[in-house]
A protein has these predicted regions:
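Short beta-strand-to-loop acidic/aromatic patch adjacent to the donor-nucleotide binding site
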Residues: 75-86
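Conserved catalytic core of nucleotide-sugar-dependent glycosyltransferases
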Residues: 67, 88-219
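Anion (oxyanion) recognition and catalysis
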Residues: 42, 100, 242
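C-terminal catalytic/acceptor-binding lobe
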Residues: 5-16, 182-311
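Active-site nucleotide-sugar/metal-binding loop of Leloir-type enzymes
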Residues: 64-77
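Active-site acidic short loop of glycosyltransferases
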Residues: 12, 73-76, 101
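Short, Asp-centered acidic motifs that coordinate Mg2+ and/or phosphate
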Residues: 77, 104-105, 248
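N-proximal low-complexity "stem/linker" segments adjacent to membrane-targeting elements
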Residues: 1-57, 61, 301-303, 311
Length: 311
């Protein structure tokens, strides 16, 4: 999707980028992206500030501290970016342009830290790795969002309304946070003293983000969907936001990466089942490609034949 917005309009928004950083650690890809974002904002004279919260092991509490820091500032838009997300700086400017009264909560899709092997298998069956096996990496993701009820397909070229979107890459308007706080006064709490200037244990802040069970016992009558789902802190925030008319949106064209660890498996015994095992530089030999295609064709023909018999 292409969005043309005058720089003068982007300058009207003051973006507060908040990153909870447990252990004070961030991925190199996040650091590079953030340097690029700072450079881009400076180039176009956009007021953008980074805030890092170190060594808070409880993620919901870290997010609530970040919100409180934002609300005590004069910035207009809160941008959550987690320390393990790789992104394009243009995406932040895009969210800033789109985040409005109509779209007060908006984010980008990033993959969960899991490989969806069934999708890789389906991509192989469709021949999407025939030209370049490295292309199969594009089909490994399960994404952090939930579509609205009844949605069967989405347009990749425009923002789409969703039930929930992850805070790993989410922008929120100040007015949305104000409305949320007024609607749910019961979530005010006194944070523990954490040896910092603004969190001394003698004032209230708000729990915009918390992990809850989605039922009336936890959230109060009328605030839950009684699904008994265990809601993560971002999904809880989105669900309660939607209850008071604050819509949540996703930009499906954005391509984000989620950095994590992976245990690399495999054995020579298992490779032996292939009879032919290519080495890393061999991207051309496909000894089983015709065998696979014939198998798929035969399976398709068999299914068609069975359908014909039923008639």
């Amino acid at each position: 999707m292409e969005i043309e917005v005058p720089v003068s309009e982007l300058r009207k928004n003051k973006v507060f980028v908040a990153t909870p950083m447990y252990g004070g650690m961030a991925s190199g890809m996040y650091c590079k992206a953030s340097c690029d974002l700072a450079t881009t904002a400076t180039k176009y004279e956009i007021d953008l500030k980074f805030f890092y919260l170190f060594n808070e092991s409880l993620v919901p509490r870290a997010r609530n501290y970040c919100v409180d820091e934002f609300l005590r500032s004069d910035y207009t838009h809160l941008m959550f970016i987690d320390a393990d997300i790789c992104y394009s700086p243009e995406y932040v400017l895009t969210l800033s342009a789109l985040c409005s009264e109509e779209k007060p909560i908006i984010g980008g899709p990033y993959p969960k830290k899991v490989i969806a092997w069934e999708k890789v298998r389906n991509a192989v069956d469709k021949g999407l790795g025939d030209d370049d096996p490295l292309d199969l990496d594009k089909f490994t993701g399960d994404f952090v969002f939930n579509p609205t009820t009844g949605t069967t397909q989405i347009s990749l070229g425009e923002p789409v309304e969703v039930l929930e979107v992850g805070t790993g890459f989410m922008m929120i308007r100040r007015e949305a946070l104000d409305a949320w706080r007024e609607a749910y006064p019961q979530f005010a709490y006194k944070p523990d003293h954490n040896r910092s200037e603004h969190f001394t244990g003698d004032r209230y802040i708000h729990a915009y983000f918390d992990t809850v069970i989605d039922n009336d016992s936890w959230l109060g009558e009328g605030n839950s969907n009684n699904s008994d789902r265990y809601l993560s802190e971002d999904y809880m925030f989105c669900q309660l936001a939607r209850k008071i008319g604050l819509t949540t949106w996703l930009c499906p064209w954005m391509s984000l990466q989620h950095v994590g660890t992976y245990v690399f498996n495999g054995s020579l015994k298992d490779l032996g089942r292939l009879e032919y095992a290519a080495h890393g530089a061999d991207m051309k030999h496909r000894p089983y490609v015709e065998e696979r295609r014939k198998k798929i064709q035969n399976t398709t023909a068999l299914k068609t034949k069975k359908k014909g018999k039923r008639k």
